[in-house]
Amino acid sequence: EASATNEMELFTTLQQLMSQNQPEMPQTAGFAAAAGGAFPELNVGVMDMLTNLQRGDTAALVVDGSSFDPELLSGGQVNVLHQLKQSPVGRAANQMDAMTIDIVAMLFDYIFDDRHIPDSLKALIGRLQIPVLKVAMLDKKFFSKKSHPARRLLDTLAHAALGWAVHADEQDRLQAKVEELVLRILASFEEDLSVFEEAQVQLEAFLKEEERLA
């Protein structure tokens, strides 16, 4: 179908861009050729490990030879997705999974490098690394549709950070609301993307109310 074809073309383009930036990364021609142009089936084992990690269960990732530091994940201040490639998750990942990890890692690199986003909000947004990675693995429309619920939530969070209030009480309210939404996603998200849509609706309503009260 046209939509699936567009998504495959997007992934191929992203792959080429990443290969240009990272010459050592092998070409993964299987993307366009897999299953006659279809995406490979979801790697259930990888998803299970990510869900456990999202919920704070890092035991399966702390093994000999793994450089993954689970303590960094709860802090949200470091891009742990780069380390994830060297963990059991990365070793179990197929080519599509590995590329998805790289692309989502690049997305969070932009967030962490944005000097306009306060560190306290970066730390909260950073805790969404694993849920967002799961979304990207579950639904490739995450990359091709700006209206995707998870992308809209990230965009709204970034815009809220740009409008970070001068007054401490307004900062505290936004911080508390974002933390509430992040914790809810961490606790409840498995495969139902509606949790991101609900969080987006609630955040927009909160921001409109804050604007009304300003």
Q: Predicted regions span which residues?
A:
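Extended, low-complexity, amphipathic alpha-helical coiled-coil/linker regions that act as scaffolds
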Residues: 1-214
